[in-house]
C-alpha cells in the first residue's frame, strides 16, 4: 500500500541530500573569542555525523557531545561505527565533552509507570539495564577520550518528592560505580525527569556529595518547569556543575504556552547566566542543544540561528 508523503517530509528528504558543506560555505560572521569550551550536540544539526562535525568546524568550535549518530543511539552504536566516528573526530581534532547517555531516562520501578511516548533518542532501556549501561558508557567515554557521562533521574512522576529517596539512592550507587571507574557522571536537570529544576538538582548533588557526580545545568529545562533559571536556578547549582546545555524558551502571550526558541530569542537571561559562569571561574564544558525548529523544520539552519544568537551574546559579554 502506498503512503502519502507530507510536504514537510518531502522538504526534509530534499535537505538531507544537500551536502552540509554547501551550507557551511556561506560566509561566517566573526564573533571573537569564546570564553568557554563550547560545542554542539551533533544530532541537533543532522544525523549525518560527518556533516555535523563539518558544521561545527565551520564555526571554529572544537567540542561536541555524542548522543545519536547515524540514526543510532550512542549506546547501540556498533564497533565499526564507533571507530568511524572516532576517525572523523580525530580528523577534525575535536574533543568529546561527554557521552550523552540515556541512563535513568526510563520509569522508576517503585513509582507508577508513565506510558506516554517520550523522546529517548532511539533508546529503549529499563532499570534492569542500568548497571550494564553504566559499564558500557564508561567504555565509550574512554574510547572517545572523555571523562564524563551524562545521566538522568527517571521519568518525572506527579509528585517527584515521593520518588526522591529512590532517585537519590540510585544516583548515589551510580556515583560509587563511577568512582571505581574514574568517571564523572553529570546529572542533567531534565524537565521530563524527577530532577528538573536547579533547586532539585542542587539538592540531590549536595545530599549525595560525591566527587564523581556533578550537574549538567540546563537552564532551558528549568524554565520549562517555571523556575527562573538565572539567577534563581543557577544559585542552587553554582559550584556543583561540570557541563551545561544552552537553549532558550519563549512564552506565547495569548496562551501562556512555553516552547523552544533560538538562543537570544526567548526570555532566559543568557547574558547574565554566561557572565556569572565566567565570573565564577566555570571551567567545564558547554553544549548548544538547539531543540528549537524553524517553521520549515530545517535542523541545521535552526541550529545556525541559535548558535549565532549565542555567539552574539558572547561578543557582548
What are these regions (language model features)?
Residues 91-94, 140-145, 174-185, 273-282, ...:
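A structural motif corresponding to the C-terminal end of an alpha-helix
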Residues 52, 85, 137, 174, ...:
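Aromatic/hydrophobic pocket-lining residues that form π-stacking "cages" and hydrophobic walls in ligand
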Amino acid at each position: 500500500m502506498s503512503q502519502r508523503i507530507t510536504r514537510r517530509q518531502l522538504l526534509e528528504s530534499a535537505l538531507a541530500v544537500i551536502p552540509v558543506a554547501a551550507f557551511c560555505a556561506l560566509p561566517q560572521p566573526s564573533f571573537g573569542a569564546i570564553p568557554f569550551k563550547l560545542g554542539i550536540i551533533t544530532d541537533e544539526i543532522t544525523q549525518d555525523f560527518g556533516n555535523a562535525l563539518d558544521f561545527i568546524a565551520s564555526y571554529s568550535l572544537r567540542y561536541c557531545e555524542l548522543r545519536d549518530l547515524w540514526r543510532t543511539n550512542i549506546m547501540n552504536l556498533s564497533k565499526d561505527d564507533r571507530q568511524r566516528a572516532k576517525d572523523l573526530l580525530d580528523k577534525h581534532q575535536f574533543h568529546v565533552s561527554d557521552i550523552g547517555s540515556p541512563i535513568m531516562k526510563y520509569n522508576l520501578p517503585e513509582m507508577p509507570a508513565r506510558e506516554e511516548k517520550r523522546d529517548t533518542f532511539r533508546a529503549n532501556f529499563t532499570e534492569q539495564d542500568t548497571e550494564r549501561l553504566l559499564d558500557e558508557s564508561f567504555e565509550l567515554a574512554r574510547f572517545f577520550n572523555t571523562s564524563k557521562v551524562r545521566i538522568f533521574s527517571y521519568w518525572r512522576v506527579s509528585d517527584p518528592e515521593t520518588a526522591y529517596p529512590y532517585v537519590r539512592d540510585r544516583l548515589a550507587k551510580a556515583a560509587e560505580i563511577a568512582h571505581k571507574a574514574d568517571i564523572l557522571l553529570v546529572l542533567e536537570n531534565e524537565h521530563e525527569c524527577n530532577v528538573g529544576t536547579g533547586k532539585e538538582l542542587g539538592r540531590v548533588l549536595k545530599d549525595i556529595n560525591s566527587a564523581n557526580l556533578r550537574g549538567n545545568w540546563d537552564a532551558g529545562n528549568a524554565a520549562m518547569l517555571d523556575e527562573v533559571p538565572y539567577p534563581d536556578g543557577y544559585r542552587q547549582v553554582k559550584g556543583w556543575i561540570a557541563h551545561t546545555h544552552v537553549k532558550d524558551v519563549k512564552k506565547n502571550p495569548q496562551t501562556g504556552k512555553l516552547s523552544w526558541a533560538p538562543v537570544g530569542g526567548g526570555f532566559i537571561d543568557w547574558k547574565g547566566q554566561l557572565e556569572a559562569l565566567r565570573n565564577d571561574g566555570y571551567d567545564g564544558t558547554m553544549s548548544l542543544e538547539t531543540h528549537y525548529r524553524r517553521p520549515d523544520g530545517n535542523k541545521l539552519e535552526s541550529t545556525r540561528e541559535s548558535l549565532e544568537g549565542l555567539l552574539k551574546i558572547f561578543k557582548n559579554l
